[in-house]
Amino acid sequence: MTEAVPTDSVDSKASSQVNSAENPFPVRAVALRIAGWIDKLGTVWVEGQLAQITMRPNAKTVFMVLRDPAADISLIVTCSRDFVLRAPVKLAEGIQVVVCGKPSFYIGRGTFSLRLSDIRAVGIGELLVRIDRLRRLLDSEGLFDPRLKRPIPFLPNMIGIITGRASAAERDVTTVASARWPAARFAIRNTAVQGPNAVSQIVEALRELDRNVDVEVIVVARGGGSVEDLLTFSDETLCRAIAACRTPVISAVGHEPDNPLCDLVADLRAATPTDAAKKVVPDAAVEQRLIEDLQRRSAQALRNWVSREQRTLVQLRSRPVLAEPLRTLTTRSEEIHRAQSAIRREIIRLVTTETERVGHLATQLATLGPAATLARGYAIVQALEDGTQTVTAAVLRSVDDAPTGTRLRVRVSDGAIVAVSEGRADGP
């Protein structure tokens, strides 16, 4: 509401002055100018979330704060008490509304506000349309891409939990997780889970836990509720904060039918907070049974292996070569001895045969040779050179080969005789 003060003289004086460091405008002049500009704006329609409603007893004016969750910007709106009582919707902090009002500037305190003339609640259908529009936007940017999902550690060192203070969701996660894995540790951050401050508090808690090196997984948990109750978890700022986390995030908001956008951005969706507890830590009893089963299977596998190897050894030892290892050597030794004896006998036989053959040939040679002929009374006659014992020609075969006076060498069986030819003899 613009404060009514006499401004003509002040405004005209300020307008006639050249504004500078030497000629500054007084505060009232500036405030009046701003008030004049704002008065010319007319009425505007504005959408936002009711963050605060202040209705003091006996006060005629009600002050409210209209907030834009996506930008964390607020605007003061005012209306009469009767306007609130006659409003077509039940005004409560956290609801999304569309208001119509006249901008005004209160000169006394230099504050800007919006004087309401109409207010309407944003319908569920419209909320769903906006959520779907945001879903398509985030999907087009790749925030739902399965390839970007970070794996949940099998056994996290510490579990970060963001949930309402003393809520059933907190109790479900911690109780079930501790029952499944008694050594589980938690870093719990209690925040508003609906209302005007929910988004900023959850985003701040997310960033704090993401910076904590001990926290290896973060669970965002809330129980079920209406579309309006869960609107916080379809907020664009929160969705982008989850996508920016380096730590894996599990969304456990609402119940099975609920599907806020943070479910799609998170690395893993849990149907309920209890389901999140089951997914964030293994069941110690199940793991113990698994280990025991693996131990039994390993022991049985080892026993089976030993049995197979024992049977193999028995089979190998039952083979003749291993049952009586010297038998093969003895057999081979006997074969070698037999071969040696056979070779020796064959060599003796061959030597004997060849000796006999040589003796037979020697006998034949002796029988057919000249010595045997001489022994039977024959003689070999050869001519000698004069005055020497040197044989000059071959064996004489004709009387013409030994004319008279030829010196001759006559070989008989036991020696040789030198003679002189006296010519041809009569008779044969």
Swiss-Prot record:
Predominant location: cytoplasm
GO BP annotation list: DNA catabolic process
Name of this protein: Exodeoxyribonuclease 7 large subunit
Any one GO molecular-function label of the UniProt entry: nucleic acid binding
Coiled-coil region(s): none
Subunit composition and interactions: Heterooligomer composed of large and small subunits.
Keywords linked to the UniProt accession: Cytoplasm, Exonuclease, Hydrolase, Nuclease
Function recorded in the entry: Bidirectionally degrades single-stranded DNA into large acid-insoluble oligonucleotides, which are then degraded further into small acid-soluble oligonucleotides.
Family recorded in the similarity comment: Belongs to the XseA family.
Stored HAMAP family: Exonuc_7_L
Any Pfam family hit: Exonuc_VII_L
Top-rank lineage group of the source organism: Bacteria
Subcellular location: Cytoplasm
Primary enzyme class: hydrolase
Reactions listed under catalytic activity: Exonucleolytic cleavage in either 5'- to 3'- or 3'- to 5'-direction to yield nucleoside 5'-phosphates
Protein EC: 3.1.11.6
InterPro entries, A to Z: Exonuc_VII_L, Exonuc_VII_lsu_C, OB-fold_nuc-bd_dom
